[in-house]
Amino acid sequence: MWNDLRMTSHTAQAGSRTRLDRFFKITERGSTVGAEIRGGLVTFFAMAYIVVLNPLIIGTTPDGTGQLLGGGTDDPNLGMIAAATALVAGVVTIAMGVFANYPMALAAGLGLNAVVAFSIAGLPEVTWADAMGLVVIEGIVILVLVLTGFREAVFRAVPVELKTAIGVGIGLFITLIGLKNAGFVTGDGATVLSIGDLGTWPMLVFIVGLVLTIVLWVRKVKGAMLISILTATVLAIVLQNTLHIGAVSETNPGGFNSAPEFTGVFAVPDFSLLGQFSLLGSFESIGVVTVLLLVFSLLLADFFDTMGTMVAIGAEARLLDSEGNPPATRRILVVDSIAAIAGGMGSVSSNTAYVESTAGVGEGARTGLASVVTGITFLLATFLSPLVALVPYEAAAPALVLVGFLMMTQISGIDWKKVDTALPAFLTIALMPFTYSIADGIGAGFIAYVIVKLARGKAREVHWLMWLAAAMFVVYFTLDPIRAALGI
């Protein structure tokens, strides 16, 4: 009898695993359930900082009427914004996993949130509801472009070498993000960049984490990145509780960039921000022309940021086809577009694809199951926000550095003797980290590609959509002079 029960139990479990395997194509893509779970967790820890950082960017900046996001003029509503940030990120990331079966997580976009906070919400008479309404409009526009096939057509018109360069450039960019977040490099010196103070306790946490990450990875230990993140976090907590290091500031330059602080385990989330947006308010406060320019700038950054991240993840996971396209491209772009809309509706700024997803891919993630794991963890973070704050930048940064190396290996796919694509590829790679913008690097590469082809008398070889994309980027780069000329 007991043997029959055990056999029935094992059969049910096997059937469940088989259904899960078939749905997410886990075995087909050379992965395992364990690898997907580890990858999903690593991705979450690599980008969990957004739950803390997004509130600090959009929650501490008053709008054009002097009001803070969530109401009030003095005390930022950081807890409310953190809960909404985690909720929206969790929902759209799960959607990416289930609908598109792609190991790519989404959350409020860094850079995009700064644009919303400083370039839109801060305009005279503009409210936070107006600013979030513009984000919703941008998301709707980009969704229409996906459904009509235009966004996917632009993506497929990009030469393979430029797609490869985008992945390599993002690798350098994410390495710089990791080094900067850890304080290993700084821009505070006499040079553009210089090495940080290596004699601090937070730097010790980063270095220990980096060494451990490298050692575990070269020895092919499963869960290398996750183990290093958790180990470095424990070290940071011990140092913080014994030495009371605190957060970095002018009076405490040797502090943590995000000090681990235990304030409890659970927190009841406040979702009051959801739905606090106005679709038409900005048209009344700043006018139609300004609205169009602002939506266009948001759209371009979102449009090509996602394209670059999508390619980088696919290349690292070896999911791209011979033309450099990931599977189910349209489904990926549909979810990404809906995420932008959801970000505006949730009052947390446009949600977009996160390049930190490559950290999970580096840990073995190959399917949407990893995204589901990441999304569920974000949903848990709405209740466990105190625990999320325990992971300092210094503990998560080593994973980003290693991922940067892994993405750099793609550079062998570029023929450097073929100047038509080599020069644009170089500019794409170089300008992403140097401008601290994925979109700027892609734009420079697109424009250079058209110029080189034109100069060599090969204009007919350029796809008409590449001409259009290059022209759009010219407008993108000249938006500030255009605004100045129009007095807006």
Where are these regions (language model features)?
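Helix-loop-helix hairpins and the membrane-proximal interhelical loops
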Residues: W2-G79, S194-I195, I229, T233-R330, ...
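Juxtamembrane transmembrane-helix boundary signature
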Residues: M7-T8, V88-L110
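Helix-loop-helix junctions within the multi-pass membrane cores of secondary transporters/permeases
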Residues: R17-I50, N54, V88-A89, G109-F118, ...
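Hydrophobic, aromatic-rich alpha-helical transmembrane segments
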Residues: R29-G40, D74-A82, A86, T127-A131, ...
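Short helix-coil transition sites and intra-membrane helix breaks within transmembrane domains
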Residues: F45-Y49, F99-G109, I142-L145, K220-V221, ...
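A generic, lipid-embedded transmembrane alpha helix
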Residues: T85-G97, A114-A117, F173-T175
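Membrane-embedded alpha-helical modules
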Residues: P124-V238, V372-I488
